[in-house]
């Protein structure tokens, strides 16, 4: 699947992300890594390159820090919006902890809780929240539903730092647990709850318990279907971003092992913030740091010899704004050549 470049007579993996751009069957691309390693810059740059070869690209940030707006210098929200200067690249920032009530409501904006005053409070919400991760799972499912209906050719996820990155793989199970709990409640108290809710004007959007269950079931189906796609290497790949330091390398190895255990394809690593001091440079710190980075780079190349390892330099300025991102993105496909 990945193209190769011949160097000194040996077959080595090409040190670029060209294989991802060339793989036209890809629909989902995840970009993940430890905090502060340049994930957002990498995902924005990859999306810019994809926009050159694909009809429509959507870049989604699921990181609560939401750095896409800062990177492009343009405000994004929970609705997909075209990135200034592009006709086929859109971006959106979603809150992975969106309210479950918002998700279950069918657009009804009534602020009154129909169960308030009955001593039940936010019973449905409390019930759902009692299952760890259900809120995030439903939020993610809702986004996937929206994304599917928008029919973008390829979707790039700028994910939250490593700990949260792979949570989406557990979401179908989480939603099944929530459904089982709500189904049990419905079979025991359904008629009574529906009559109480009916008297109080129903749930938001005029739904009853059964409709609420159907809504959750459809979200679960969506997320299960997409999860199947996530495990198909023709449709999904994961780009790991790191820096040449021990902790980042350790996190990357842990993440790759976890991705492999879930059956998710990963064959590309972007190593950011590399120093290339000029020969004879008198900068002690630069030379010492470069020596350390070389050691970890060698380990990365040894561990991941069948990966596309992309080496990106540490730049003197922040990579912010369309022009700088475009310049940076070129180095993902044309390897950086350090000045002598």
Curated annotation (Swiss-Prot):
This is ATPase get3. InterPro entries: Anion-transp_ATPase-like_dom, ATPase_ArsA/GET3, ATPase_ArsA/GET3_euk, P-loop_NTPase. The active site is at residue 63. The lineage of its organism: Eukaryota, Fungi, Dikarya, Ascomycota, Pezizomycotina. Homodimer. PANTHER family: ARSENICAL PUMP-DRIVING ATPASE ARSENITE-TRANSLOCATING ATPASE, ATPASE GET3. It is an enzyme of class 3 (hydrolase). It comes from the Eukaryota. It comes from Aspergillus fumigatus (strain ATCC MYA-4609 / CBS 101355 / FGSC A1100 / Af293) (Neosartorya fumigata).
């Amino acid at each position: 699947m990945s193209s190769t470049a011949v160097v000194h007579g040996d077959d080595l993996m090409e040190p670029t992300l060209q294989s991802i751009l060339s793989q036209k069957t890809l629909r989902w691309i995840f970009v993940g890594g430890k905090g502060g390693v340049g994930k957002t810059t990498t995902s924005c740059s990859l999306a810019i390159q994809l926009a050159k070869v694909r009809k429509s690209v959507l870049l989604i940030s699921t990181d609560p820090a939401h750095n896409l707006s800062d990177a492009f210098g343009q405000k994004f929200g929970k609705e997909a919006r075209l990135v200034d200067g592009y006709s086929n690249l859109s971006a959106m920032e979603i809150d992975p902890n969106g309210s479950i009530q918002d998700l279950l409501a069918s657009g009804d904006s009534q602020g009154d809780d129909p169960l308030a005053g009955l001593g039940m409070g936010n019973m449905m919400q409390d019930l759902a929240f009692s299952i760890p991760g259900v809120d995030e799972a439903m939020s993610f499912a809702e986004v996937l539903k929206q994304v599917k209906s928008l029919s973008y050719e390829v979707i790039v996820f700028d994910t939250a730092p490593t700990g949260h990155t792979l949570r989406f793989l557990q979401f179908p199970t989480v939603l099944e647990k929530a459904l089982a709990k709500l189904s049990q409640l419905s079979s025991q108290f359904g008629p009574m709850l529906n009559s109480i809710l009916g008297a109080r004007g129903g749930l938001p959007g005029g739904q009853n318990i059964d409709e609420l269950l159907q809504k959750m079931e459809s979200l679960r189906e969506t997320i299960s279907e997409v999860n199947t796609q996530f495990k198909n290497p023709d449709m999904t790949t994961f780009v790991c971003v790191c820096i040449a330091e021990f902790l980042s390398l350790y996190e990357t190895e842990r993440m790759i092992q976890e991705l492999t255990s879930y059956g998710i394809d990963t064959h590309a690593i972007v190593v950011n913030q590399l120093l290339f001091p000029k020969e004879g440079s008198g900068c002690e710190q630069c030379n010492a740091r470069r020596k350390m980075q070389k050691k970890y780079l060698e380990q990365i190349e040894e561990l991941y010899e069948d990966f596309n390892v992309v080496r990106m330099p540490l730049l003197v300025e922040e990579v912010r704004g369309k022009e700088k991102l475009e310049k940076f993105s070129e180095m993902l496909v044309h390897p950086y050549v350090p000045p002598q």
